[in-house]
């Protein structure tokens, strides 16, 4: 695929490192900003805020603890950024190593960028904690597995029970979206 055929991304994509940048640029025509780890400097946060005001920002970090930490730091400093998520499967290395954007296929990257979420920090919860409990997502023998599958299906990343409520609220996932996802993830034939 030549440069002219690649999907063009207007926003700046925030990634963790230079290998992530290389992989993103194989998949799409986009500018990136690298955090160079989870200890994000005030200068980098200022750059992200400036880019958000001028072009918009997409946070695209690894589906691991460090990636979630970076995502949280940026979200708190610059509310309203967009988020792209890879599944752990899509970010797995072919041999040894840790999960990372740098291991994802161009197709997986384009798919993640096609399903962006924008935070609504002050949004009203559309789904209650009780809804999550009744669905078996916060307790019970299958809760962890159901949350993993739900995170993959909705492309919002893996969360624990408490984080799930916050993330569904943050991204304004509707009861209908949750119901459709639950029907899919609880069908063992899909996994």
Curated annotation (Swiss-Prot):
One of its GO terms (cellular component) is cytoplasm. One of its GO terms (molecular function) is ribonuclease M5 activity. Mg(2+) 1 binds at residues 16, 62. Mg(2+) 2 binds at residues 62, 64. Residues 10-93 form the Toprim domain. The keyword Cell membrane does not apply. Its main location: cytoplasm. It catalyses: Endonucleolytic cleavage of RNA, removing 21 and 42 nucleotides, respectively, from the 5'- and 3'-termini of a 5S-rRNA precursor. It comes from the Bacteria. Its EC number is 3.1.26.8. SMART domains: TOPRIM (SM00493). Pfam families: DUF4093, Toprim. The keyword rRNA-binding applies. Belongs to the ribonuclease M5 family. PANTHER family: RIBONUCLEASE M5. This is Ribonuclease M5 1. It comes from Ligilactobacillus salivarius (strain CECT 5713) (Lactobacillus salivarius). The lineage of its organism: Bacteria, Bacillati, Bacillota, Bacilli, Lactobacillales.
């Amino acid at each position: 695929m030549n440069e002219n055929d690649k999907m063009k991304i207007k926003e700046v994509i925030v990634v963790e490192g230079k290998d992530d940048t290389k992989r993103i640029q194989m998949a799409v025509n986009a500018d990136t900003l690298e955090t160079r780890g989870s200890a994000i400097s005030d200068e980098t946060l200022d750059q992200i805020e400036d880019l958000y005001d001028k072009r918009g920002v997409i946070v695209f970090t690894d589906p691991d603890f460090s990636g979630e930490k970076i995502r949280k730091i940026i979200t708190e400093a610059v509310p309203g950024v967009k988020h792209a998520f890879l599944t752990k499967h899509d970010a797995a290395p072919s041999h040894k190593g840790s999960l990372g954007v740098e291991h994802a296929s161009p197709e997986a990257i384009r798919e993640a960028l096609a399903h962006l979420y924008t935070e609504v920090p002050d949004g009203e919860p559309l789904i209650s904690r009780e809804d999550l409990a009744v669905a078996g997502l916060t307790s019970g023998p299958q809760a962890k597995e159901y949350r993993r599958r739900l995170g993959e299906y909705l492309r919002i990343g893996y969360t624990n029970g408490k984080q799930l409520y916050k993330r569904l609220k943050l991204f304004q996932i509707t009861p209908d979206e949750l119901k459709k996802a639950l029907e899919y993830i609880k069908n063992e034939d899909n996994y």
